[in-house]
Amino acid sequence: MASPEEMGDDASEIPSPPKNTYKDPDGGRQRFLLELEFIQCLANPTYIHYLAQNRYFEDEAFIGYLKYLQYWQRPEYIKFIMYPHCLYFLELLQNPNFRTAMAHPANKELAHRQQFYYWKNYRNNRLKHILPRPLPEPVPPQPPVAPSTSLPPAPSATAALSPALSPMQYNNMLSKNDTRNMGATGIDRRKRKKGI
């Protein structure tokens, strides 16, 4: 067994961690924004095709980076993502068959079309079924109509019941020959034909 003095000597031989560790001046904000921008670019099939054409998917470090980026699927990070398809494509990029298939332009077009059809049809149809609809209001039973003697209405009561005219109704009462459409000669410009 080693004496305590010998153990003290061994402890001094262990290198201490460097004192000049790098500290991010903005607390990781720039890295966060760069990763957010990159992951949202993955929502574009043309960009994935570009990465495949330039053989990024053959680099093991890049594949590891794509695996690392899966932390964006956690709830505390997903709230920052504006294009949720990027997470779907990130999941697909974990499959090597998908990575190699995206190098072909026809597969890029297929992915782009499927994405478009999802936005056009599925999402809207799905929302129709998800959003709550108000229940139809029950129609109250109408009381039986009692025979009554018809008296002519008083003129003041009729005037009080007539609704006020809206501005659109006032415009209909104006004549079609509005002075704004008249030229200096008094001819309606809307009705004038060329060549006369």
From Swiss-Prot:
A Gene Ontology molecular function term of the record: transcription coregulator activity
Q: Name one GO cellular component term.
A: mediator complex
Alphabetically sorted, this entry's keywords are:
Activator, Nucleus, Transcription, Transcription regulation
Give the residue ranges for region: Disordered.
Answer: 1-24, 133-196
Q: Where is the composition biased (Acidic residues)?
A: 1-12
The question of whether Transcription is a record keyword is answered with yes
Biological role: Component of the Mediator complex, a coactivator involved in the regulated transcription of nearly all RNA polymerase II-dependent genes. Mediator functions as a bridge to convey information from gene-specific regulatory proteins to the basal RNA polymerase II transcription machinery. Mediator is recruited to promoters by direct interactions with regulatory proteins and serves as a scaffold for the assembly of a functional preinitiation complex with RNA polymerase II and the general transcription factors.
Q: How does it assemble?
A: Component of the Mediator complex.
Know the name of this protein?
Mediator of RNA polymerase II transcription subunit 31
Give the species: Arabidopsis thaliana
